[in-house]
Swiss-Prot record:
tRNA processing as UniProt keyword: no
PROSITE patterns from the UniProt entry: SHSP
Species the sequence originates in: Drosophila melanogaster
A cellular component annotation (GO) from this entry: cytoplasm
Keyword Mitochondrion among record annotations: no
Biased composition regions of type Low complexity, renumbered to the chain: 243-268, 365-377
Compositional bias (Basic and acidic residues): 384-408
Superkingdom of source: Eukaryota
UniProt xrefs under SUPFAM superfamilies: HSP20-like chaperones
Region feature (Disordered): 222-284, 296-408
Name of this chain's protein: Heat shock protein 67B1
Length: 445
């Protein structure tokens, strides 16, 4: 058997031992203290062949990587394992250190040590959580449910000797098992400081106990006639039927037009024969809005009666209609006179009279100032003769002036309407007087 492997192992162990001694002397942390990762590890000089680096009196083969980073001098004396629990002292110390660290952090943050005794149980009696909270008063504890989660919270502040404040606070969360109702959760606090949170178990669901809802559906027999009726389109509603019936009735029996009060028109017109037309009564037919020509003609007929009832500036009789209507009717009358004579849809005038009298539509209105009556008398006394063209031209000029005046009246306000009306009547009287003078001169010739 060769001694070479044994000699190599011994040399390696001696090298490790010498290095460990140097670390023990030069370590500033002191002997017996175990700082974790306090000093940088020297590079591994061993050739390793699968064995760990043991800095101990007795080398331990197969040591874990976590223990290789710690320097523990007690392993030189105590050995690798203990006889009682078959664990190395390093592992035991590590476990104790973890417990001490957790305990220190718990005391620092104010976590009560007794709260670690809380436990939860799920059995046939339901879900139950118990915890020792004797360091908390009842008003310092809060139990609430968020969806299917139970949250237990405690907050305690205590002042000691006026120098410091001890604060304890904890939060515990528990998930309810599936099927438990959060609304059924209730909690109790005993006199010895045990808080119990309970939730009753859900009702057992037995598959056989489920009641089935059964209903027998009747089979109705449908005849062929009902089938044909169902195939027909739906009938209109009663409202539509009534509307159709009323429309049919109105079509068969058209309603007569409502008679309007007749307007007595006194037209003192002198035709070519010098005869005076008598009064005639006719119903005032309102022209359709869409037909502009008929509307203009109807307004031309209604204008004399309206102007006849209009009060002049001489007698001061109250006006029956609005001033705006007067202006509109006067404008329509003058426009109809300027344009070519249009047939009146209400009054049927013979074409022969139109041919004889070129100024048939120029109807002087018998106003209340008395001038119209004199003109009518003079027309009766005159012999049969045609009117000269001079009067026609003068009348056209007067009509153009009247149209201009009416347009100006529309632009003016309502305060000047009475004065403008008087001016229009005066212009009409002057036109009548001019026509009479022209006739007199013709007769004198």
């Amino acid at each position: 058997m060769s001694l070479i492997p044994f000699i190599l192992d011994l040399a390696e162990e001696l090298h490790d031992f010498n290095r460990s001694l140097a670390m023990d002397i030069d370590d500033s942390a002191g002997f017996g203290l175990y700082p974790l990762e306090a000093t940088s590890q020297l590079p591994q000089l061993s050739r390793g062949l699968g064995r760990g680096n043991a800095m101990m009196w007795v080398p331990i083969k197969g040591q874990s990587a976590a223990s290789q980073h710690r320097h523990h001098p007690y392993n030189r004396v105590a050995g690798a394992k203990t006889a009682c629990c078959n664990k190395s002292l390093v592992e035991l110390e590590k476990e104790l250190g973890d417990k001490g660290t957790s305990g220190a952090s718990g005391s620092t943050s104010g976590q009560p040590a007794a709260s670690k005794s809380a436990y939860s149980v799920v059995n046939r009696n339901g879900f139950q959580v118990s915890m020792n909270v004797k360091q908390f008063a009842a008003n310092e504890l809060t139990v609430k449910t968020i969806d299917n989660c139970i949250v237990v919270e405690g907050q305690h502040d205590e002042k000691e000797d006026g120098h410091g404040v001890i604060s304890r606070h904890f939060i515990r969360k528990y998930i309810l098992p599936k099927g438990y109702d959060p609304n059924e959760v209730h909690s109790t606090l005993s006199s010895d400081g045990i808080l119990t949170v309970k939730a009753p178990p859900p009702l057992p669901v037995v598959k056989g106990s489920l009641e089935r809802q059964e209903r027998i559906v009747d089979i109705q027999q449908i005849s062929q006639q009902q089938k044909d009726k169902d195939a027909q389109p739906p009938k209109p509603s009663e409202v539509e039927q009534q509307a159709a019936a009323s429309a049919t009735t109105s079509t068969l029996n058209p309603t007569a037009p409502t008679p309007t009060p007749s307007l007595s028109l006194t037209l003192a017109e002198s035709n070519g024969n010098g005869q005076e037309e008598t009064e005639m009564e006719m119903p005032a037919v309102s022209p359709p809005i869409s037909n502009e020509a008929a509307a203009a003609a109807a307004v031309a007929v209604e204008a004399p009666s309206t102007a006849g009832t209009t009060s002049s500036a001489n007698n001061g009789v109250a006006e029956p209609e609005s001033e705006s209507m007067e202006v509109a009717l006067a404008k329509n009358e003058e426009t109809a006179n300027v344009d070519e004579p249009t047939p009146n849809p209400v009054i049927s005038i013979e074409e022969e009279q139109k041919a004889e009298d070129a100024n048939a539509n120029e109807v002087p209105v018998a106003s209340n100032n008395g001038n119209g009556a004199v003109a009518a008398a003079e027309d009766v006394e005159m012999p049969l003769a045609k009117k000269p063209e001079i009067s026609t031209e003068d009348s056209k000029e007067e009509q153009a002036e009247k149209v201009d005046k009416v347009e100006k009246v529309e632009e003016k306000g309502g305060e000047e309407l009475a004065a403008v009306d008087a001016a229009i009547l005066l212009a009409k009287n002057q036109g009548e007087n001019g026509a009479t003078a022209a006739k007199t001169e013709e007769l004198a010739k």
